[in-house]
């Protein structure tokens, strides 16, 4: 791919942050499947000498199980290079001496080993999938409404995501329901939180203008990165929709067909 004057901003890039679901793979039955060309694209980035990190709002598995699933697909990824909301919220809970009521996926529960959940004084909500029943949502509501100062943590705030059989509602929908019912504003842990992105940047030891984010979610991936001073590329895979390219509130610095094309652009124009 020839150098493109519209991609001049890539010349200063020393590091890349990749979203995972919708960029590397589509989730679904059997663990999902890798998006065409993404395994090789990740390898090319690793071989390029650029700093590489992975940033996900995945909350249906522990990081270890999540990375294991990706390795089965062919990705050579280290757990220490993957940043997800659950470990981050555990640190917050411990620092603030909070005891959560958990409305999360069963497979995420091990992330909270050692966290005191007796007599809850806050609620943590993640992508609970089938556990988002009326009964479970109402139980979380009752905990929140019964607190003098309700505290709600949401592991991301996505509206929907793509699985192999179609789009699925994400945690943000249920977060909004609890916010409305309890007149409380959730503390978002994960993308698009600036603090979450700053944690990744600190680990890379790079400045925001030296890093580009590649994601399929215009608001949480691209917009979140841009709010921290990074550039954002949106791929036309995963939850991408053509209407994203004329969104009035967030505009990606560039749009590319897939991760392979994003890597072509980054390596050619840096």
From Swiss-Prot:
What is one GO cellular-component annotation here? nucleus
Question: What cofactor is needed?
Answer: Mg(2+)
Query: Where, subcellularly, is it found?
Result: Cytoplasm; Nucleus
Quote the cofactor binding remark. Answer: Binds 1 Mg(2+) ion per subunit.
What InterPro entries does the annotation carry? HAD-like_sf (IPR036412), HAD-SF_hydro_IA (IPR006439), HAD-SF_hydro_IIA (IPR006357), HAD_sf (IPR023214), LHPP/HDHD2 (IPR006355)
* EC number(s) stated in the UniProt entry for this protein: 3.1.3.-, 3.6.1.1
Q: Where does substrate bind?
A: 19-21, 56-57, 191
Q: Pfam families per the record?
A: Hydrolase_6, Hydrolase_like
Q: Which UniProt keywords apply?
A: Cytoplasm, Hydrolase, Magnesium, Metal-binding, Nucleus
Q: Does the keyword Nucleus apply?
A: yes
Molecular function terms, GO-annotated: inorganic diphosphate phosphatase activity; metal ion binding; phosphatase activity
Residues reported in the UniProt entry to bind Mg(2+)? 19, 21, 216
Q: Which GO terms describe its biological process?
A: phosphate-containing compound metabolic process
Catalytic activity annotation: diphosphate + H2O = 2 phosphate + H(+)
Q: Which PANTHER family match?
A: 4-NITROPHENYLPHOSPHATASE-RELATED, PHOSPHOLYSINE PHOSPHOHISTIDINE INORGANIC PYROPHOSPHATE PHOSPHATASE
What is the recorded function of this protein according to its Swiss-Prot or TrEMBL entry? Phosphatase that hydrolyzes imidodiphosphate, 3-phosphohistidine and 6-phospholysine. Has broad substrate specificity and can also hydrolyze inorganic diphosphate, but with lower efficiency.
NCBIfam families named in the record: HAD-SF-IA-v1, HAD-SF-IIA-hyp3
Q: Which family does it belong to?
A: Belongs to the HAD-like hydrolase superfamily.
Q: What name appears for this protein in its UniProt entry?
A: Phospholysine phosphohistidine inorganic pyrophosphate phosphatase
């Amino acid at each position: 791919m020839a150098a493109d004057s519209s991609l001049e901003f890539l010349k200063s890039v020393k590091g890349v942050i990749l979203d995972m679901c919708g960029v590397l793979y589509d989730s679904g039955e059997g663990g999902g499947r890798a998006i065409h060309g993404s395994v090789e694209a990740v390898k090319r980035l690793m071989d390029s000498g650029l700093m590489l990190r992975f940033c996900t709002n995945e909350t249906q598995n522990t990081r270890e199980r999540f990375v294991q699933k990706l390795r089965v697909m062919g990705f050579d990824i280290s757990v220490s290079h993957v940043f997800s909301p659950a470990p981050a919220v555990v640190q917050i809970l411990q620092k603030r001496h909070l005891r959560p009521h958990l409305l999360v996926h069963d497979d995420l529960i091990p992330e909270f080993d050692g966290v005191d959940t007796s007599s809850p004084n806050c609620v943590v909500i993640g992508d609970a999938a089938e556990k988002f029943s009326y009964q479970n949502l109402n139980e979380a509501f009752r905990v929140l409404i019964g607190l003098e100062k309700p505290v709600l943590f949401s592991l991301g705030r996505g509206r929907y995501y793509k699985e192999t059989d179609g789009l699925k509602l994400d945690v943000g929908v249920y977060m909004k329901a609890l916010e409305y019912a309890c007149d409380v504003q959730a503390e978002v842990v994960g993308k698009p939180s600036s603090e979450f992105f700053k944690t990744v940047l600190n680990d890379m030891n790079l400045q925001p203008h030296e890093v580009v984010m590649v994601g399929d979610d215009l608001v949480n991936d691209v917009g979140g990165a841009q709010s921290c001073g990074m550039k954002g590329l949106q791929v036309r895979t995963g939850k991408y929709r053509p209407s994203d390219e004329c969104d009035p509130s967030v505009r990606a610095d560039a749009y590319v067909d897939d991760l392979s094309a994003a890597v072509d652009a980054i390596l050619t124009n840096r």
